[in-house]
């Protein structure tokens, strides 16, 4: 534990459910599904374990739901394609058996399974992704995007949107939609960070007398690479902008901009060190974030030793940044969310 920076608890003072509440529900659930993942070829058979000390598993029942999770552009929630109930098979205490439900159905991309005990209490709900969710669909019909290069910037106009890229570092410096300015800037750029109390091999740094004070801090690695220039090409009705780099961690960023103003980005980077965090980042003013909606594990974030509990679904919460034990606003907005398929933040601009 690290004072107020430690992992969250189970419930708050007024029984507010914290992240670990769901972890405990999963870890100590007396009926366990012993399957890590499923796919669209799922035949309906599941290995389950009865961890009751005295009760037979047939005192419980399962509710199954084949659902369709929304795509990136779909603002709706989960659609139930098929659902039903089945009784647990005859499995003695501490035994293992097979639960059979209808096989995966066409059109469903996820499966939810809820086990209920003999008193009607829901013990836990597992969720499994069966198929990939449809990604962002770029509309290629319409007027081809136009672009212009100057000594300072590369600009692309498409669908009433203007994207501005810097000739100095290759990064996106702003997006305008008519008179509106979207404040997403300075990216993508490489980021890697390690805990400041650790040495380069990630062990505790006993040579640093101040290490104890740094255990909640992170040290970032500077990318020594340099931007070498843009290459622009037309691909059908799309314009593809590639920012190239050398001698560093970031290799390239490829922007595909469609006639409707939709932009998709692919990037590559390399890094051979040992770190806690690694990826790419942009800048966006925190005070302009209102909420976020995501498809992935939720509604709570995960922690180093608390990976169980959150389940695949459609989740949404408003921005919050509470100090632990000072307020009890849950779920927390910030943090590391497992199995994230996509997120859609709601900005002020």
Predicted regions and their residues:
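Beta-strand/loop-rich accessory regions of lumenal/periplasmic or secreted enzymes
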Residues: 104-106, 135-344, 348
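Extended substrate-binding grooves/exosites of carbohydrate-active enzymes
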Residues: 1-47, 53-58, 63-78
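Buried hydrophobic-core signal for structured, non-transmembrane domains
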Residues: 45-52, 111-115, 160
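Solvent-exposed strand-loop boundary residues in beta-sheet-rich modules
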Residues: 68-72, 119, 178, 286
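Intrinsically disordered, low-complexity Pro/Gly/Ser/Thr-rich segments with frequent PxxP/GP/PP motifs
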Residues: 73-106
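Short beta-strand/loop motifs in extracellular/secreted proteins, especially
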Residues: 58-62, 109, 276-278
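Short, acidic/polar linear motifs in exposed loop/turn regions
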Residues: 52-56, 119, 271-273
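Terminal connector regions
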Residues: 105-137
């Amino acid at each position: 534990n690290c004072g107020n920076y430690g992992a969250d608890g189970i419930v708050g003072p007024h029984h507010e459910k914290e992240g670990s509440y769901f972890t405990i529900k999963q870890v100590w659930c007396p009926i366990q599904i012993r399957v890590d993942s499923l796919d669209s070829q799922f035949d309906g058979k599941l290995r389950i374990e009865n961890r009751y000390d005295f009760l037979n598993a047939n005192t419980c029942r399962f509710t199954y739901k084949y659902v369709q999770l929304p795509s990136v552009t779909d603002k709706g929630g989960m659609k139930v394609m098929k659902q039903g109930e089945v009784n647990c098979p005859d499995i003695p205490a501490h035994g293992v058996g097979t639960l059979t439900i209808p096989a995966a159905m066409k059109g469903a991309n996820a499966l939810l399974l809820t086990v209920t005990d003999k008193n009607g209490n829901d013990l836990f709900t597992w969720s499994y992704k069966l198929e990939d969710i449809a990604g962002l669909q770029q509309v290629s019909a319409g007027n081809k995007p136009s672009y212009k290069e100057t000594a300072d910037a590369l600009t692309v106009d498409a669908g009433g949107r203007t994207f501005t890229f810097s000739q100095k570092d290759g990064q996106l410096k702003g997006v305008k939609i008519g008179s509106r300015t979207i404040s997403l800037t300075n990216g993508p750029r490489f980021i890697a960070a390690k805990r400041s109390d650790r040495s380069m091999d990630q062990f505790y740094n006993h040579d640093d007398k101040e290490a104890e004070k740094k255990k909640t801090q992170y040290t970032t690695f500077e990318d020594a690479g340099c931007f070498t220039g843009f290459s622009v090409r037309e691909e059908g009705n799309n314009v593809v902008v590639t920012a190239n780099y050398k001698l560093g961690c970031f290799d390239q960023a490829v922007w595909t901009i469609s006639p409707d103003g939709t932009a998709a980005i692919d990037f590559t980077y390399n890094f051979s060190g040992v770190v806690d965090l690694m990826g790419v980042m942009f800048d966006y003013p925190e005070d302009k974030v209102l909420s976020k909606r995501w498809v992935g594990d939720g509604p709570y974030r995960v922690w180093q030793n608390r990976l169980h509990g959150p389940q695949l679904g459609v989740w949404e919460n408003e921005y919050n940044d509470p100090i632990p034990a000072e307020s009890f606003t849950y779920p927390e907005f910030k943090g590391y969310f497992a199995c994230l398929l996509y997120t859609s933040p709601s900005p002020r601009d």
